[in-house]
């Protein structure tokens, strides 16, 4: 199985709340990807952190270890899926989440997210949550 890591999963890792390195090792680094959108969101988060330089270095290290999937891969399905969701009154509130979900679908990747409810209306999207709550 191949995985697209949602931004919230990456943030859990960067904050030290998820042993993502170990999980990626188990799943196979070659099977784990991030979207260009996730890189944008991580950069924004780093620029708004208390220690900008440290946060940007952490993002650099993290991003350099994974293959980045371009959002252009979902261009063909974007209009079709957004129109479908609009017609049923279920447009996603977050356009970035929408693009991440479509990127997973277009590339036949399982989306790893802690926000499963945000993606329930996307047809054909496989979802996993690697966050274990006790």
What are these regions (language model features)?
Residues 1, 101, 105-134:
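Acidic, PIN/NYN-like endoribonuclease modules and their adjacent C-terminal/linker elements
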Residues 1-34, 46-65, 134:
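Short, well-structured N-terminal submotif of metal-dependent ribonuclease cores
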Residues 6-7, 42, 78, 104, ...:
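Generic structural signal for small/hydrophobic residues in well-ordered secondary structure
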Residues 9-10, 38, 74, 117-118:
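Alpha-helix capping/helix-boundary segments
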Residues 36, 53, 72, 93-94, ...:
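Non-catalytic, surface-exposed connector residues within folded enzymatic/regulatory domains
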Residues 49-53, 85-87, 129-131:
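Short, hinge-like loop/turn segments at secondary-structure boundaries
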Residues 67-112:
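Active-site neighborhoods of divalent-metal-dependent phosphate/nucleic-acid chemistry enzymes
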């Amino acid at each position: 199985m191949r995985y697209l890591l949602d931004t919230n999963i990456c943030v859990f890792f960067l904050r030290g709340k998820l042993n993502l390195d170990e999980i990626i090792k188990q799943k196979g680094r070659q099977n784990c990807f991030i979207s260009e959108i996730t890189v944008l969101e991580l950069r924004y988060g780093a620029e708004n952190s208390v220690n900008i330089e440290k946060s940007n270095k952490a993002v650099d290290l993290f991003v350099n270890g994974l293959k980045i999937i371009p959002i252009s891969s979902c261009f063909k399905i974007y209009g079709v899926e957004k129109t479908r969701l609009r017609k049923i009154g279920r447009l996603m509130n977050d356009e970035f989440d929408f693009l991440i979900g479509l990127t997973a679908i277009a590339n036949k990747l399982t989306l790893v997210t802690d926000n499963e409810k945000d993606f329930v209306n996307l047809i054909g999207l496989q979802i996993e949550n690697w966050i274990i709550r006790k």
